[in-house]
């Protein structure tokens, strides 16, 4: 129908239906160009119709933060006490500590980390992200809501956020998504975690400089 957003990559069409004729459909793409598609191609090829998203009142965010796995560790007692003072984490810390204490009293033979269950910084961060999104009025609470770990990769441990915004308009949706991830990237160091990223030219230059310095010092000592 007119005005519906459709996506048909095989014809480089991605935008709103601007005209429907007997033998063609004209689509105005987001870059303001037009794509004319023969009507019979809609019977021969698949296409994505975004009308369902627009009418549902929710637009999906599906994006991951890749955590440097070398920074994943158990929480110290001091850190657990500090996180308990976080408004979004107090209930989680209390309930999780009760759960772990009950399990450890029944199953653990000692307080050694190998034999007991303890709070971790990655698990606590995941709980924080969940609580933060639940408290965000721009995130739907009755559509699919997931904060989950995916399989580890060479680029780190993906923590995926799969939620829906309450505003489906493109610019507003992008703003909501950016605000969420701006906050999460900024708060991540509070949990002793770091985002994984591939070494840049500056990183490699620093390593090369350190290597040259060590070689020079070794030569001088010799």
Q: Which residues are covered by each model-predicted region?
A:
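Soluble accessory domains appended to multi-pass membrane transport proteins
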Residues: 2-109
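Long, non-transmembrane cytosolic or organellar matrix-exposed soluble domains/tails
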Residues: 84-222
């Amino acid at each position: 129908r007119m005005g519906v957003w459709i996506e048909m990559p095989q014809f480089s069409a991605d935008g709103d239906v601007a005209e429907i004729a007997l033998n063609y459909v004209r689509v105005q793409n987001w870059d303001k160009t037009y794509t004319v598609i023969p009507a019979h191609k809609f019977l021969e090829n698949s296409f994505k119709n975004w009308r369902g998203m627009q009418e549902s009142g929710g637009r999906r965010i599906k994006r991951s933060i890749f955590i440097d796995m070398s920074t994943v560790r158990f929480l110290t007692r001091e850190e657990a006490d500090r996180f308990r003072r976080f408004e979004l984490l107090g209930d989680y810390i209390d309930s999780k500590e009760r759960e772990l204490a009950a399990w450890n009293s029944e199953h653990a033979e000692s307080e050694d980390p190998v034999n007991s269950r303890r709070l971790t910084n990655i698990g606590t961060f995941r709980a924080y992200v969940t609580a933060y999104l639940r408290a965000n009025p721009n995130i739907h609470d009755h559509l699919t809501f997931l904060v989950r770990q995916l399989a580890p990769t060479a680029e780190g441990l993906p923590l995926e956020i799969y939620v829906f915004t309450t505003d489906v308009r493109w610019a507003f949706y992008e703003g909501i998504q950016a605000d969420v991830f701006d906050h999460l990237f900024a708060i991540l160091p509070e949990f002793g975690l770091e985002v994984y990223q591939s070494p840049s030219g500056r990183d490699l230059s620093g390593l090369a400089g350190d290597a040259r310095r060590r070689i020079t010092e070794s030569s001088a000592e010799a």
